[in-house]
């Protein structure tokens, strides 16, 4: 299942893109009972089952939120992927869309009488969801150094420490998690 939402900058101007992406992942993973791997992977039993992507369009003054979620487990080029039938059972795509839509709305919807979700609340919830994987003895490396991930910044970056220094990890390019 692939779905996308288009949201105006004015509706999300209080969010940094990094924290918004991680928060959406936390909300969806919480609703589905699965894990979140920073910054945007949805994980079930150490297998990727979906992901979240944000794309901005300054000319349209909008951000598109894309969510992809596998229905069936599969293997592609020797890599196993989970599907929602593994963790949620036999549910159709329309019902799964409703769950994901509600998860995204829980963050973004501010129409009365609903108050805006606090960024600090979602930063904390995101850290809790990310910690589910990080606390299971995974190996994390950044810039070819072993690091301990110790927090999530208010912009959605990972805070990590190595033997020699502190790091703010902004990009997955030099970051690695091994289960």
Place the predicted regions along the sequence by residue:
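Catalytic beta-strand/loop module used to bind and position nucleotide/cofactor moieties
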Residues: 4-179
């Amino acid at each position: 299942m692939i779905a996308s939402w288009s949201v105006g900058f004015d509706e999300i101007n209080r969010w940094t893109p990094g924290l918004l992406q991680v928060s959406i992942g936390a909300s969806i993973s919480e609703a589905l009972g699965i894990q979140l791997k920073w910054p945007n992977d949805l994980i079930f039993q150490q297998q990727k089952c979906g992901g979240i992507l944000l794309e901005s369009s300054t000319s349209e003054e909008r951000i598109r939120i894309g969510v992809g979620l596998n229905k069936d487990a599969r293997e592609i080029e020797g890599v196993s992927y989970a599907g929602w039938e593994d963790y949620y059972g036999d549910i159709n795509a329309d019902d799964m869309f409703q769950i994901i839509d509600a998860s995204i709305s829980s963050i973004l919807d501010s129409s009365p009488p609903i108050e805006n979700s606090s960024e600090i609340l979602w930063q904390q919830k995101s850290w809790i969801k990310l910690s589910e994987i990080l606390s299971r003895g995974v190996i994390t490396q950044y810039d070819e150094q072993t690091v301990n991930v110790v927090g999530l910044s208010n912009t959605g970056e990972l805070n990590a420490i190595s033997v020699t220094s502190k790091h703010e990890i902004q990009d997955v390019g030099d970051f690695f998690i091994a289960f």
